[in-house]
């Protein structure tokens, strides 16, 4: 199954802004992204909200618990509940992260990195294949933010992503802030990374802010998008063209008007990136 590109700008739907999205007389954004697990429930307010939002906006489902990097495999119960939500919402697409979250019943509640080895590739691809079979749709996988590397890494992250897509037919959700954070933490060139990502597999872009830790940049989603990430986004716009782009804010969430103004910056930066690409 082939997914169709969506050219638009959106926001992550968060509880402080539910009412504004539901009460607005006109659409506020081109699409919304929701955290899948927040709506994988049997009833109640979450399903009322997602049903109402779905009537007004295209919706992307974005998960944090699939754990495609786990040697334990992806849990079938989780996939079946996710499929139930996807069948209800009819989303633009379903995405999660290239990571693992736990092992042998332990849940770290974090997005842990996978080693970039052939052994890990086999695990990841088998888990993606199972997920796509159960969900009956292709997945988008997001590049992680990274704070450690593995001594036995056999390839760069962008090489791993490209091979993963080639083997499974999955797509990419390219997080520009994560690229910048990982590049800063590990000393690689984020623009060379962008240049190596397969153009035809990128369907969505995330934009977010980060914080400076004692030694590393941390992907905190509690700050506005910084100039360094905007500059990288312009380069991405020039390379990948019209793909869905959205801003994530998960902590210190500002008023919705502030995020809508930031989304206007995203539109302007995208246009600047496209102009630069056409002039080159």
Swiss-Prot record:
Effect of disrupting the coding gene: Not essential even when cells grown in the presence of its inducers dichromate or cadmium.
InterPro entries referenced in this protein's UniProt entry, alphabetically: MbnB/TglH/ChrH, Xyl_isomerase-like_sf
Residue ranges the record marks as coiled coil: none
Entry annotated with the keyword Zinc: no
Regulation: induction: Induced by potassium chromate (K(2)Cr(2)O(7)) and cadmium chloride (CdCl(2)). Induction by Cr and Cd requires sigF. Probably part of the CCNA_03001 to CCNA_02999 operon.
Record keywords, A-Z: Stress response
Protein family: Belongs to the UPF0276 family.
Name listed for the protein in its UniProt record: UPF0276 protein CCNA_03000
Organism of this sequence: Caulobacter vibrioides (strain NA1000 / CB15N)
């Amino acid at each position: 199954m082939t997914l169709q590109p969506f050219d638009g700008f959106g926001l992550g739907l968060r509880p402080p802004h539910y009412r504004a999205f539901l009460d607005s007389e006109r659409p506020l954004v081109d699409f919304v992204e929701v955290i899948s697990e927040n709506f994988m429930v049997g009833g109640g307010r979450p399903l009322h909200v997602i049903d109402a939002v779905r009537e007004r906006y295209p919706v992307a489902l974005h998960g944090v618990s699939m754990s495609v990097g786990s040697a334990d495999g992806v849990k079938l119960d989780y996939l079946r509940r996710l499929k139930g939500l996807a069948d209800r919402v009819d989303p633009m697409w379903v995405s999660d992260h290239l990571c693992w979250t736990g092992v042998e019943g332990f849940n770290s509640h974090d997005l842990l990195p996978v080693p970039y080895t052939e052994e890990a590739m086999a695990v990841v691809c088998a888990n993606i294949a199972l997920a796509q079979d159960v969900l009956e749709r292709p997945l988008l996988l997001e590049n992680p933010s990274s704070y450690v590397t593995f001594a036995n890494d056999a390839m760069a992250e962008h090489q791993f992503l490209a091979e993963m897509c080639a083997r499974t037919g999955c797509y990419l959700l390219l997080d520009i802030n994560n690229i910048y954070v990982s590049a800063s933490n590990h000393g690689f060139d984020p623009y060379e990374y962008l240049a190596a990502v397969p153009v035809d597999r990128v369907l969505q872009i995330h934009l977010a802010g980060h914080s400076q830790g004692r030694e590393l940049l941390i992907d905190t989603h509690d700050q506005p998008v910084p100039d360094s990430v905007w500059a990288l986004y312009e380069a991405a716009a020039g390379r990948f063209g019209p793909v869905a782009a959205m801003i994530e804010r998960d902590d210190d969430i500002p008023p919705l008007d502030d995020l809508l103004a930031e989304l206007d910056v995203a539109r302007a930066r995208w246009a600047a990136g496209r102009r630069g690409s056409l002039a080159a």
